Amino acid sequence: MFDWLFKKNKNDEYVSCEWLEYGVNFGAIGIHHCCQFSHSDKNDKPVSSLNSKNQYCVREFFKQKNIVRKQHKKGKINERCIGCFDLKKQVWEDKNKITRMAIGPNTKCNASCIYCYTSYKKDFYNNKKDIPILYILKNFVENNLIDKECEITFNNGEPLIMDEFEDIVNLFVDNNVGKLRVHSSGIKYSTAVRRALESGRCDFIVSPDSGNKELYKKIKRIDAFDKVVENIKEYAKIQPTQSNVQLKYIIIPTVNDTFEALKEFIDIAKECGVYRILLDIELWWYRKNSKNNTKIRKIFELAKQAKYYMEERGIILLPSIIFDEASSSHKDIYDEVMMN
């Protein structure tokens, strides 16, 4: 249906990225080509309205995407992409498929993490209405515009309390479309997530950031630790492999940055039947301290201790976004600490 938007061009190398070529981000204010916001001082404005309830919303999005692609083929980098770490020069296949998707049209959350940007205006963000996107996603699916192996990530707010969450997940599962990656507080149990896990096409990530009630309540500012642990155990029981349910620990200096706190967390993961742990660094702390090699070294030393403790229990450590950035930017320190 949309093939006319993707006329074949000579397969020369040019600078672009997976998101620009084949990505879509359903954000809180519109549809974007990508979900990166840290690479440019230019605000990423939507290319189409999420309120449209007809195929022209999708048509307009692909028209805009093709314009950006043609611009990059001519060697003109979009100003909003300058400095982005995802850019690379290669031959990009002309195809009318979405291979990366981010879904985060909501800002509501059932926790109030001390590090989250929404915590400063909780009433405002929790009272914002969800932007409906189910109709648009159905249009994508019906027109075969989503690759079967598309990476579909749910983020922003708490996905499980989105009005359309269950229907959206069931849409993907019923049509055998995409590999889902759902980031959640773990407070609410979802039958749709259960179905997605059972299908083998979903990774479910919960970020308790703690291994006991007191620390959990301090970080999340809600008393729900026992409920979260109970839900994690239920999800872990049905995961097809040991990698589908994952726990995340965001290191928050002066709050949970001790080996004792991490050990408690790792022990809880083991008790729940979880064998993959994502380790990350609190974003705003890292932005402020990224040039302080002494502080960064301490983070790496803590990660090394945690890694050994996990390995003894059959758990695999997976670096997450900010930790990855830190280990790349401070590769010499990281290698020195982790390899010795």
Predicted regions and their residues:
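Distinct, well-ordered alpha-helical segments
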Residues: 164-170, 190-198, 257-262
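Core AdoMet radical
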Residues: 98-108, 117-134, 147-162, 173-189, ...
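Glycine-rich helix-loop-beta junction characteristic of Rossmann-like nucleotide cofactor-binding loops
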Residues: 142-146
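Conserved C-terminal portion of the radical SAM core fold
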Residues: 149-153, 178-181, 202-208, 226-330, ...
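Leucine-rich repeat
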Residues: 133-140, 165-167
